[in-house]
Amino acid sequence: MVALENPECGPEAAEGTPGGRRLLPLPSCLPALASSQVKRLSASRRKQHFINQAVRNSDLVPKAKGRKSLQRLENTQYLLTLLETDGGLPGLEDGDLAPPASPGIFAEACNNATYVEVWNDFMNRSGEEQERVLRYLEDEGRSKARRRGPGRGEDRRREDPAYTPRECFQRISRRLRAVLKRSRIPMETLETWEERLLRFFSVSPQAVYTAMLDNSFERLLLHAVCQYMDLISASADLEGKRQMKVSNRHLDFLPPGLLLSAYLEQHS
């Protein structure tokens, strides 16, 4: 714990302490929050106050005495670099005419007593402890990114084993798989729909393909092709006819390496 010397204490208060000094916990020696100079300052000035305070604290560390002192100084400068990059427009105060902007992370931290306490606790630690904290935060950020997986736009279907021909066929509903295995499938019709979908979504992967189909078996084949290609298909009544709508759930269109018609021929 950081302690301050109390010059007003008498001899009776110095008992039990080396040198006759009385040490008080830091929180009890601080002025009240309501009368604090930092409280009366704007957010930008308050940010600069904490930065200057950190710089002054770092200047107290001898810069040419040992590896630990140098490491502590480098950690402090590294944190200040991160914090300064999060600030707003330079030279603008609260009263200046400027477009409203949401407060940065550092401004919010300066207004939060818990964050300030954590920052002070970090600054009071040794250089080795600070290094461990920074290393832990970096590792934690990388592990969270791995847990989130690929972001939107990162398509890994080519190397994903879930997109092998067998897994693509298993993606088709059980009822449709039974029909494809037991019935005599008109391969020409199946290949025609595969060719149409390939041509359409290869050019416009985010568009919606529509078709009017009154034949229920042909709609069934189209549903099967869409499920095999990982497309979304739905049918609805439109002016007494059945309309099919097909859309792509991904940003890009990557068809399986083996089409459904070829897969059925291999396993017939």
UniProtKB/Swiss-Prot annotation:
InterPro entries from the UniProt entry = R3H-assoc_dom, R3H_dom, R3H_dom_sf, R3HDM4
- CC annotations in GO: nucleus
Location of the region described as Disordered in the Swiss-Prot/TrEMBL record: 1-21, 142-164
Q: Which species?
A: Homo sapiens
Q: Please state where this protein is localized.
A: Nucleus
**Protein name (database record):** R3H domain-containing protein 4
Q: What superkingdom does the record give?
A: Eukaryota
Which CDD domains did the record assign? R3H (cd02325)
Q: Disulfide pairs?
A: none
Name of the gene encoding the protein in the UniProt record: R3HDM4
Upper lineage is: Eukaryota, Metazoa, Chordata, Craniata, Vertebrata
Give residue spans, biased composition: Basic and acidic residues. 151-161
Instruction: Provide a Gene Ontology MF annotation, just one.
Output: nucleic acid binding
Domain R3H, chain residue ranges per copy? 187-250
Q: Which UniProt keywords apply?
A: Nucleus
